[in-house]
Amino acid sequence: MLTINMKSELLYKELKKYGFGPFTGVADSVFGGFFIYLEELNEYIPAANEGLALSIASGSYLAGKKPVVLLQNAGIGNLINPQTSLNDLYKIKSLLMIGWRGNPNNPKDAPEHWLMGEKTLDLLKLISIESKILESLDDIKWANDKLQDNNTVALLINPGVIETYNKNISSNYEMTRYEALEIIAKKTKGMIRFSTTAMVSRELYEIDDSIKNFYIIGSMGHISAIALGTALQKNEKVIVLDGDGALLMHLGALSTIGNIKPKNLLHICLDNESYSSTGLQNTTSSTTHLDKVALNCGYKDSKTALTKNELENKLQELLNINGPNFLLVKVKPGNRDNVKRIELSPEEITKRFMNALK
């Protein structure tokens, strides 16, 4: 029988009853409350990407534990390599709990989830992961039993099955992300701009839509690499609008940019130390000096803005010099209410952008 709004506390206790833990992963909105519950218990290890999460889990298995990896199905691609060349090869066991975005039975989901949602079951089977849809706490026993004979098994979680668990947030930073984007949009108006997935793209679209804006709604962590590819083919200034969670997911892109040194690239990271679109779960940016990372990766200059006045001045300084340059903008966690969705299809975004660059 399908359980609706399963309590995070009961789910956690059932997992612990069978000896599961530790818990690691990448935040997901489908069961975002469970991540927050684990954070409050200090039982969650945030990973920058899903492959890293599975590797952490594998290491804990080698130390005698029964690890759990939490993720969204969009991140399955990131863990295919450690699943096929580590877990399967070395007979290392892990339980995956996967938020199922784009389930064909949920046709109203966002377009970036449609293909992966349709192929999730087939993809798991293809890489030898037996799966089951989580419908009740009894399915934890199923997972435990199946792990006796399998290296990795997965429980798929549909929206609404696990209850929402709200997080209390506080911040000492002055700006909201929306306020920072208003300043950035004004100073970079008419320039080529690449904006990262989720709320950064939606807010930029609302503040200053432009035919030279390229909004991505998926491909988390790849925006700076996409921008690099364009910057190397154009002479005009290219602006990257990134987020801390996305930047951390594929941090190696900074080293590539620093090595290639495109003079026309300015990389801006709007850092709220959380995953805004999935429930404000913590990233690891609070203990990572991203501005220094960029500088040590070979960026020409790197600055940090904590206030509106600093953002105005430091952004202008970096716009006036050759790059690649990096600007870290610390902002409050949270989202502006009722920000509209991008009304262009992904294909329309591509065609409009390419025509603008001709």
Task: Please place each PLM-identified region on the residue numbering.
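DG-centered beta-turn motif at the end of beta-strands
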Residues: A74, K237-L247, G252-L254
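A short, acidic, amphipathic alpha-helical segment used as a generic capping/interface helix at domain edges
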Residues: S8, N144-D145, K308-N320
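Active-site flanking residues adjacent to catalytic metal/cofactor-binding acidic residues
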Residues: I157, L241-D244, L270, V329
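Long, charge-dense
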Residues: P107, E273-L280
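Residue-level marker for buried hydrophobic side chains located in beta-strands
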Residues: R193, V238-L241, I268
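A short alpha/beta connector and helix-capping loop motif
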Residues: S94, H250-D271
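Active-site regions of oxyanion-processing enzymes, predominantly non-cytosolic
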Residues: N151-L156, G323-V329
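Thiamine diphosphate
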Residues: M1-K125, I129-A227, L232-E236, T284, ...
